[in-house]
Structure formats: C-alpha cells, structure tokens
Design a protein with these regions (language model features):
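Canonical Rossmann dinucleotide-binding motif of NAD(H)/NADP(H)-dependent dehydrogenases/reductases
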Residues: 2-34
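Conserved glycine-rich Rossmann-like NAD(P)H-binding loop of the short-chain dehydrogenase/reductase
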Residues: 29-45
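The beta1-alpha1 cofactor-binding region of Rossmann-like NAD(H)/NADP(H)-dependent oxidoreductases
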Residues: 40-41, 64-76, 110
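Residue(s) in the substrate-gating loop at a strand-loop-helix junction
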Residues: 148
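SDR active-site lid
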Residues: 185-257
Length: 309
C-alpha cells in the first residue's frame, strides 16, 4: 500500500494512546477514519483532533464500541459504513483496543481476568470476523492486529504476575499468524499485519484501573510511572506501525526494547524467564556485555551458530 490517501480505515481503541495517534496520522494523510472507543467522549475528542489536521474532504467519525461485545462491533461496522457513505468496503482495520489488569490467575477475580482476555483477544477476533468481509471487497485490504512483546514473553519481570494480558496477546499472535496462511489461500489480496509494541507511553494502566473501579486520582497516580518511564511516545509508535504497513511488513516490532526482547527470546528460549538475564536485556546492558551471559550472538552483526561469517 503506497499511500493511505483516499482509503477508509477503522481504528479501535481510538480514544487515547496509539489509537488516537493512528487516527490523527491517517487523517492527516487524507485517509477517512472511523474511530471507536469504549468511551464515546474520548473517541469524539480524537475525531476533533484528527479533523483539525486532515485535508478538506477527509471524513473522521467517532463511535462508541466495546470490542468485547460482538453485537457492538457489528453495530460499529454498520455505523461506520453509513457515516462514510462507501457502503461496501473498508481498506484498513486497526484492532488496537486493549486493556490491562488481572495479572494473577490465582489471586485476581475470575471476572476481571475474563474481562481483560475478552477485550484483548476476543475484541481482535470480533473485529476480524465482522470486518474481514469488507476488507475482502477492497482491492488491497489490510488487517492490523495489535499483540505485544507479551505475546512472546509472558512477563513484566520477577515477582509480577501477568497472566490475562499475556495469554490474550499470545492468542492474538497465534491467531494473526494463522490468518496469514488462511488468507493466502482464500483472499490473497488481503494482508494481515501483526504489531508487537514494547513499552510505549500510553494511558493503558490508568484507563484499565479506572475501568475496574479504581478512583480516577489513584489510577492516574499509579499510571504516571508507566507513562513517564516509557522510552517511546505513542506518536513515535504510530509512525513505526504506519511505516510498516505501508512497506508491506507482516510483523512490526515497536521500540528498541521490543527488538531486544524478540532477538534474545528467539536466540535463547530457555533463558526467557531467567530474570537476571532478561533484566539485562531490557536495560540494554546485555547488548553492551553479551559475553557476561554467554550471548555470543546477541548482536545481529555476529554470526549465529551454523551461520557463515
């Protein structure tokens, strides 16, 4: 896809973070966008920001939708088509909506765990189920599913359980990769793109806590540390994603931490839950002193075992 101009995109979780940035950046390039969020006001705010940077004639609409609810996703589809007047196709679907929480399968309430999994996996599934027929009517449809580095490393570090989110993101990764072959056979003009962000400055922690009933002030204080320590902005992440989609990539790692984790886990799967080593990977110190951990080929320029130099 050489250009987003004149296309129609759907973005879930468009009320903040990467979703908001995707909406604005797509609109700025002349792409019509239907943005949804579980919070109507947040989606409306995003749409207003996007319209301010969009060329004349570019339509951006806001919709309320809980992606965990299949009926709401179907309603969102109908509203988007009606609002954009195209009637029969969508060119891009960004399944970006997500939530956190329910880290412990043992200690957290089952309903909280199931809610996180429902948003983070079933939300992606529902969007694929509802929008794929419309993507198939596009000349070059693209389904962009957001997983996470937690889709290949189910941890936040030692002593921090992270089961619901990680399980869902692993499921998104597997589902997306399986769809690649399915579509190659059944709809070869439609692409699936798997996005795996690392630590990005978004309000997912704050929004997730508020959704589970934590007072807003407390949620904002708890989420501020996550936001402030992120090495990559939501705007920077959206740029990486859109560049990857435009270039034809099927797998997009977002952030240097994502690249480091992916490289190390692939090279040393048995070390994935050795927290001394993984902490070094995340901090970047392993790349500085790989021999300390026996990672002789952590640097991409170093030949791997069995690889010619």
């Amino acid at each position: 896809m050489d250009s987003f101009a004149g296309k129609l995109a759907v973005v879930t979780g468009g009320g903040s973070g990467m979703g908001r940035e995707l909406v604005s950046k797509l609109a700025a390039q002349g792409c019509g966008v239907a943005a949804c969020d579980v919070r109507q006001a947040a989606a409306e705010e995003t749409a207003a920001l996007a319209r301010a940077v969009a060329p004349d004639g570019t339509r951006v609409t806001a919709h309320a939708c809980d992606v965990a609810d299949a009926a709401q996703v179907a309603r969102f589809r109908d509203e988007a088509l009606a609002a954009h007047g195209d009637g029969n196709h969508v060119d891009l679907v960004f399944s970006n909506a997500g939530t956190g929480g329910a880290g412990s399968f043992i200690n957290d309430p089952p309903e909280m765990w199931e809610r996180v999994f429902a948003v983070d996996f079933w939300g992606v599934y529902h969007c694929a189920r509802v929008f794929l027929p419309l993507l198939m009517k596009s000349t070059e449809g693209v389904l962009v599913n957001t997983s996470s580095v937690n889709g290949f490393w189910a941890s936040l570090g030692a002593g921090i359980p992270h089961t619901a989110y990680s399980a869902a993101k692993f499921a998104v990764k597997g589902f997306s990769e399986a769809l690649i072959e399915d579509l190659r056979i059944s709809a070869p003009h439609v692409r699936v793109v798997l996005v795996m962000p690392g630590h990005v400055a978004t309000n997912i922690v704050t929004n997730s806590l508020i959704a589970f009933g934590v007072p807003e002030k407390d949620a904002m204080e708890a989420g501020q540390g996550f936001y402030d320590t992120a090495p990559l902005s939501a705007s920077g992440a959206a740029d990486v994603i859109l560049d990857g989609v435009r270039s034809g990539a099927w797998r997009i790692l977002v952030g240097e931490d994502a690249h480091r984790l992916d490289q190390y886990v692939r090279a040393y799967p048995e070390d994935a839950y050795d927290y001394e080593k993984m902490s070094a990977v995340l901090s970047g110190s392993l790349a500085e002193d790989p021999a300390r951990f026996g990672a002789q080929w952590f640097d991409e320029d170093t030949p791997r075992p069995g690889q010619a130099s």
